[in-house]
């Protein structure tokens, strides 16, 4: 039951094969069994059971609220949830309880979704490994899979080193982990430069970043206002389309959302790609791209071409400048957004209050980790009067050129772009943290941040297992507000691949998940 897709679970609920409370209890039990993964910051057990009991009554009366009624979900802990702690995985907001629900959260609740808890992340979503949370790093569930154990010749009698488990990617690593492990059927993440797609790729699930403005950001604690988008993590493309239909549309609380009504859509069961033109950006042959990803990318292009699609090489000439441009704009907006955390209104407040300036400085020093403080410093540097035109304004101009590159390609007749999602499979934790956050983020975001810069929809789909038995994903980038076309092509690819979901390595005697990595890497 826990391995089903969202739509399969919804069908089982409608047919009475299982009750919402039974499904909720199964998920809660599995959350406890897999707690070593550290996917959740807060588990809302009582709240979930109450919601599930209410769903039971609706199903008895034959009046379910929608496709998500009774479906267990999880929310990244940078979305506001009324009455439930929202921490952003930071000391700055530890203990903070928002007075309202984010719009996406409220829309899910209005559909009857059952809220299992808040998922772990890099502090304030600044990272690409889910390793910089005050609640400890998130462990990739594939570290405990049969495929990884077999490929790396590990057994539960050996390899008791933390370096043997691999990262989830980030910053929405908890959300991707929760869906991949089977503790919920849907998780909401945020995506500023790839923060939903990156961990989805590393965890072998589907990660959708909608077009900027299609889904409300109200209640998402901002990182970069001009790029932040709520992301959707599911087990299959059809599920992502279902959830998008619930979340998309205008929100009076978010002036950047579209004004026109959004029409939910279902993807066709049979997809024909013979009239589709797929673009392969030549600039995405980036340094560090693994041979496995390169081969997979090429094989997928051939697969599409053999099915009748037109596959053409295209150029996005300003791509080489994109990651640097992204860094300037990202840190500048971070510096602005983080200014609100001053110890006066909400969040952490230092005891050092000899003066207002001393309070500000101590609060931010105690509340933010080094990564956040470093990005604030970088952003403030770019925003200095003497640097503003040279860095920030120039980066804005380059961003426009990057967006124009995509417009030209799509206007040439290309429907969707096919690219890698990441440079390779997930790195071991101890290897990942050897390099600083900034370097790692630049490496991990190289293929994903362009879609955020241009405001385009993009989805990553699991495609294969690496030689180490870990998931590899490929990314499809579509035209603005053309999610239906994008997801239809992604579904076709998904059906051709038929990717096998995670199978935990279990003890043959007691059936428990084998945890060969016995030492805890978490510290709060």
UniProtKB/Swiss-Prot annotation:
The active site is at 76 (charge relay system), 171 (charge relay system), 195 (acyl-ester intermediate). GO terms for biological process: glutaminyl-tRNAGln biosynthesis via transamidation; mitochondrial translation. Subunit of the heterotrimeric GatCAB amidotransferase (AdT) complex, composed of A (qrsl1), B (gatb) and C (gatc) subunits. Its main location: mitochondrion. It is found in: Mitochondrion. Allows the formation of correctly charged Gln-tRNA(Gln) through the transamidation of misacylated Glu-tRNA(Gln) in the mitochondria. The reaction takes place in the presence of glutamine and ATP through an activated gamma-phospho-Glu-tRNA(Gln). GO terms for molecular function: ATP binding; glutaminyl-tRNA synthase (glutamine-hydrolyzing) activity. This is Glutamyl-tRNA(Gln) amidotransferase subunit A, mitochondrial. HAMAP family: GatA (MF_00120). Keywords: ATP-binding, Ligase, Mitochondrion, Nucleotide-binding, Protein biosynthesis. It catalyses: L-glutamyl-tRNA(Gln) + L-glutamine + ATP + H2O = L-glutaminyl-tRNA(Gln) + L-glutamate + ADP + phosphate + H(+). Its EC number is 6.3.5.7. PANTHER family: GLUTAMYL-TRNA(GLN) AMIDOTRANSFERASE SUBUNIT A, MITOCHONDRIAL, TRANSAMIDASE. Pfam families: Amidase. Belongs to the amidase family. GatA subfamily. One of its GO terms (cellular component) is mitochondrion.
